[in-house]
A protein has these predicted regions:
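Rossmann-like AdoMet
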Residues: 1-58, 72-112
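Conserved glycine-centered beta->alpha loop in an early N-terminal alpha/beta scaffold
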Residues: 61
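Glycine-rich SAM-binding Motif I of class I
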Residues: 64-69
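S-adenosyl-L-methionine
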Residues: 101-154
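A short SAM/SAH-binding and catalytic strip from SAM-dependent methyltransferases
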Residues: 159-174
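Conserved beta-strand signature within the Rossmann-like core of class I S-adenosyl-L-methionine
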Residues: 160-162, 187-197
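A short glycine-rich, Lys/Arg-flanked "PGG" loop and its adjoining helix->strand segment in the class I
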Residues: 173-190
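Conserved Class I S-adenosyl-L-methionine
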Residues: 203-216
């Protein structure tokens, strides 16, 4: 069974938008700055991995891969020498390779990382796909399937979570309380999660799952 390719259209200012939900993959101002502030900063990185030889990040909503490139960029600059970064990311609708390359070209500072990721971009085939990134001391496990199924099939625990599904009003399934409970069950002690949304239902769902919610 094939994971459905992501139907993309482009906004006038050059951002990819997912037609099914009518939502852009990142904000109009600066998607990279947004990723760094919301997800890296929201998860206390790089401080959270201080003194660690390995670190695991989980993500709901791989999208263009921008969050992961921002993470890899920080890891290569501020990660532990010889350390290992493991990323587990979930995406139900993988963006076509050419569209991802077009989207990521907006940030030349990430070009080295982007070229490697695009070169190893998997086929849109339902299942778990491992992308080895030894030049950056990292490995990416990309689950192309429903988030609930992906979490049920993963035996890991994340030290940090990037919760980056489309807006709750447009994609409520990504923010279901049972899904947030599963995220909590796959979290290491002291794990932190970053998310762009301040929707009340998401805040309540995170609190019910055991997270302490604070606005950054």
């Amino acid at each position: 069974m094939q994971a459905g390719p992501s139907p993309i259209e482009w906004t006038e200012d050059g951002r990819p938008r997912f037609i099914l939900y009518g939502d852009a993959y990142f904000g109009a101002d600066d998607g990279l700055a947004e990723s760094r502030a919301v997800f890296l900063g929201g998860c206390g990185l790089p401080g959270a991995w201080t003194g660690r030889r390995s670190f695991t990040v989980g993500e709901l909503g791989f999208g263009t891969g921008l969050n992961i490139l921002a993470l890899l960029d920080l890891w290569r600059r501020a990660g532990p020498a010889g350390g290992r970064l493991h990323v587990f990311s979930i995406e139900a609708h993988l963006m076509p390779r050419d569209d991802a390359a077009r989207a990521l070209a907006a940030w030349p500072e990430l070009s080295e990382l982007a070229e490697v990721l695009i070169e190893r971009w998997p086929e849109a085939r339902r299942g778990f796909h491992r992308i080895d990134l030894p030049e950056f001391g990292a490995v990416l496990d990309l689950a192309l399937m429903d988030a609930g199924e992906a979490l049920a099939g993963w035996d890991g625990r994340a030290d940090a979570w990037f919760l980056d599904g489309f807006a709750p009003a447009l994609n409520p399934d990504m923010w279901r309380e049972d899904l947030l409970q599963a995220v909590a069950a796959h979290s290491a002690p002291g794990a932190r999660a970053g998310t762009f949304t301040v929707a009340g239902r998401v805040r309540r769902g995170l609190e019910a799952a055991g997270f302490e919610v604070r606005r950054a």
